[in-house]
A protein has these predicted regions:
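Extended rod-forming repeat segments used as scaffolds/tethers
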Residues: 10-12, 64, 137
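Glycine-centered tight turns that cap/initiate beta-strands
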Residues: 46, 129-132, 138
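STAS-typified acidic loop motif
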Residues: 29-66
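Conserved catalytic submotifs in the C-terminal HATPase_c
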Residues: 44-46, 84, 116, 140
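A charged, well-structured terminal subsegment
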Residues: 137-145
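Non-catalytic signal-transmission and effector/linker regions of two-component phosphorelay proteins
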Residues: 1-43
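Compositionally biased, intrinsically disordered low-complexity segments enriched
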Residues: 15-16, 28-29, 114, 119, ...
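Amphipathic alpha-helical interaction surfaces in cytosolic regulatory modules
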Residues: 55-133
Length: 145
């Protein structure tokens, strides 16, 4: 199991990417996202399960994007996002998931969202994004499909 907690490579990558975009050198790795989102990754059967806990927004999106991209690069195209601990998702987080869906679909897989809390599910309902993902009530349902 791998955990992306804002203290490892994904955080360093996000800080470097942010610094390149806005020209600021913050000199503090992960300072904008430390502790706000963690992502645990594990493989079960033919599924790569990513458990996101915390807030998925423009400050933390890279912490999910990196392990999603790594899974796809390693040929694991059936991605299951366990959203049971995800407390918030903004448009940047939604775009990370939509981007992963396009890549996974192109590779013959897909992205399945499991156990979304009502506040997170509402973002997907309002935007219509729930129609393009496999949305499941529980993680077990997502894995069984």
């Amino acid at each position: 199991m791998t955990e992306w907690d804002g203290l490892r490579t994904a955080s360093e990558h996000q800080t470097a990417t942010t610094a390149k975009r806005d020209g600021m050198d913050r000199q503090t790795v992960g300072s904008t996202n430390r502790g706000r989102l963690s992502v645990e990754v594990r493989t079960e059967g033919r599924s790569e399960i990513l458990t996101a806990a915390g807030e998925l927004d423009h400050h933390t999106a890279e912490l999910l994007r990196v392990p999603l991209d790594e899974a796809l690069e390693q040929g694991r195209s059936r991605l299951v996002i366990d959203c049971s601990q995800l407390e918030f998702c903004d448009s940047t987080g939604l775009n990370v998931l939509l981007g992963a869906r396009l890549k996974a679909d192109a590779a013959g897989g897909g992205v399945h969202l499991a156990a979304m809390r009502p506040v997170v599910a509402r973002v997907f309902e309002i935007t219509g994004a729930d129609a393009v993902f496999g949305v499941h009530t529980t993680l077990q349902d997502a894995l069984a499909e």
